[in-house]
Amino acid sequence: MTLPAIVLAAVLSAATSVHFPVSTNDPPAQAAIDRGLFLYYAYKGDGAGRSFDEAASHDPGLAMAFWGIALAEGPDLNTPMTAAHFEVAQRAIRHAVLLSGAASERERTFVAIMARRYAGTFADWNADDAAYRDAMTAFAESSHDENAQLLAAEALL
C-alpha cells in the first residue's frame, strides 16, 4: 500500500475516534491526550492545546503531554507559525525531551522528531520544519502507526 493510501485510511479511521496510547497510569490524562489529538486533526489548535495542558496537569511527568503542547502550538493550514507560538512550542518540547526517559520507544521517537522542529531559533524555523517533515515522513513510512502517518501527511501540507 502506498503512503497516500495509508494516510487516507488513517484519516478515515481517525475521523470517528483517536486513541494515542501513552505511558500514563492516569485515565483522565490518557483521555485528554486522545481528545487533544482529535482536536488537532480537526484543525482546532487552541482546543488541542487546552487538552494537552489538561493531560500535563493530570500527569506532570508525561512527556507526550508536552509533546502535544508543542504540536498544537505549531502551524497548520489555517495558522502560520509565529514567534510567540514558536517560543511556547520550543519550551514544551524541551521539557518533553527531559521527561522522555520514562516514555516508550515509540513516544521517544515522536518527541525526538518534534524536537527537530524547534531545534534552533525562530529565524531558523523553516529549515528545522523541513527536518521535522523529513523525519516524520521517514517514520511514517517505516511504521504502521496511523498517527505517525497522519502527522506526516499534515507536515507535507
Each predicted region: which residue ranges?
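Hydrophobic helical h-region of N-terminal Sec-dependent signal peptides
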Residues: 8-12
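Bacterial N-terminal signal peptides that target proteins for export
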Residues: 1-7
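Short coil/linker segments at helix-helix boundaries
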Residues: 13-144, 151-157
